Design a protein with these regions (language model features):
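N-terminal post-signal-peptidase region of extra-cytosolic proteins
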Residues: 66-81, 104-106
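Bacterial Sec-dependent signal peptides at the C-terminal "C-region" and cleavage site
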Residues: 16-24
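Bacterial N-terminal signal peptides that target proteins for export
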Residues: 1-8
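Sequence context surrounding c-type heme c attachment/ligation sites in exported
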Residues: 23-32, 39-47, 51-56, 83-195
Length: 195
């Protein structure tokens, strides 16, 4: 009888400990009552994939230089590492920051300054018939509607991204993974005329 009582007490202690354990943080897309994507919070604590400088889709120089920093949720990154595929509800946040070069003790180079805006890419086939949707946030926006079907972001990613709608060819830590799983499209590295 004592043995049974000890097992019951031990079982209850385990249940209490499980209930008190902090919930694992797995950020997923959140939407408001209008169906607009809420601005992802704490995205700078996610997995950093890559940064670009001076990324411009035009052959002409832009009016300003900026950095683009790409982040994805840790759980989505881990899933990709196991399969070479992005799971549903993966979110990529492109943090767009102004570049500066004159306020540093360094004589050359650039560094990041103020946030200009965010671009967010979401894989969610329950909301998007094309699986992927694109959202743009001004520096202070709290929510954003999806860009129209067939928008220029969607079309470019569809035509040039190496894995699904993502530019894994520019994410050195994931390119090898995608190649190992056979999900990498080698042809997408040829971007001589990516219009």
């Amino acid at each position: 009888m004592k043995k049974i009582l000890c097992l019951v007490v031990l079982g209850m202690i385990c249940l209490v400990m499980l209930a008190a354990a902090p919930e694992e943080k797995m950020p997923k897309p959140q939407y408001d009552e209008k169906g607009q994507l809420l601005r992802p919070t704490d995205y700078r604590e996610w997995m950093f994939l890559s940064a670009g400088f001076g990324m411009n889709y035009s052959p002409e120089p832009g009016s300003h230089e900026m950095f683009t920093n790409v982040f994805v949720q840790r759980w989505a990154y881990d899933e990709f590492a196991k399969s070479g595929k992005w799971p549903e509800q993966s979110m990529f946040v492109i943090d767009e920051r102004e570049a500066a070069s004159r306020s540093s003790i360094n004589q050359k180079g650039h560094y990041q300054t103020d946030l200009m805006g965010l671009a967010v890419e979401v894989k969610d086939s329950s909301r998007n018939p094309d699986k992927w949707a694109y959202y743009g946030f001004a520096a202070d926006s709290k929510s954003s509607g999806a860009m129209a079907h067939g928008n220029s972001c969607w079309a470019c990613h569809d035509a040039h991204a190496a894995v699904e709608h993502t530019f894994v060819q520019f994410y050195p830590t994931l390119k090898t993974v995608a190649k190992q799983f056979g999900t990498y499209n080698e042809e997408r590295e040829k971007v001589a005329d990516a219009k």
